[in-house]
């Protein structure tokens, strides 16, 4: 992720502190350690700190501009926004908002899911992410190929820009054409966007 991170230097009394690495990933995590974690919300529940996205800080920016404006400013676009959509579902299935949002975005674009080369589907919780993946029929090989929010974190204020950036960099890395970025939003909403590599 180094190419996606702009290092921030903070001057302290002890000297410079450089923020240039995502601190959320835990490379030493094991299945055994995850299996021992206690449920977070209900005594007999299945959601634990190991299968839920982390609560962490983050910042991201994502510039959307008309191609001619970008060219005049001397910038080369990474991609073109093909379509986007928002949708809502009943509160009791609030994590499934990406399902209708994705279907609407695909329909607006005149594209199908199998045309997507990269899919970033934000993971609030494993159960939520699995439900979205199952209902939409997401290809596991194309979905969150470099880790999702459970592994990398879910800095709420920047998650949309964060996962869109990840998708575009991966699209360029593999030489793909289209990517889908989708996430649930509190209260039953979902959002999805489709980009085409420039």
Locate each region found by the language model:
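Short glycine/threonine-rich loop-to-helix capping motif typified by GTGT followed
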Residues: 16-21, 91-98, 123-141, 155-160, ...
């Amino acid at each position: 992720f180094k190419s996606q991170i702009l290092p921030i230097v903070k001057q302290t009394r002890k000297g410079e502190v450089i923020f240039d690495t995502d601190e959320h990933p835990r490379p030493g995590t094991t299945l055994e350690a995850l299996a021992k974690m206690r449920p977070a919300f209900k005594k007999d529940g299945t959601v634990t700190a190991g299968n839920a996205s982390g609560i962490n800080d983050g910042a991201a920016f994502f510039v959307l501009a008309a191609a001619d404006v970008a060219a005049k400013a001397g910038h080369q676009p990474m991609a073109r926004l093909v379509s986007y959509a928002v949708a809502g579902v009943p509160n009791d299935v609030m994590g499934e908002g990406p399902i209708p949002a994705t279907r609407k975005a695909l329909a607006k674009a005149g594209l199908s899911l199998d045309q997507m080369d990269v899919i970033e589907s934000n993971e609030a919780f494993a159960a939520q992410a699995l439900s979205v993946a199952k209902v939409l029929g997401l290809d596991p090989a194309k979905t969150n190929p470099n880790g999702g929010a459970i592994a990398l974190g879910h800095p709420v204020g920047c998650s949309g820009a964060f996962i869109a950036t990840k998708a575009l960099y991966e699209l360029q890395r593999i030489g793909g054409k289209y990517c889908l970025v989708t996430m649930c939003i509190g209260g039953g909403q979902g959002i999805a966007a489709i980009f085409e590599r420039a």
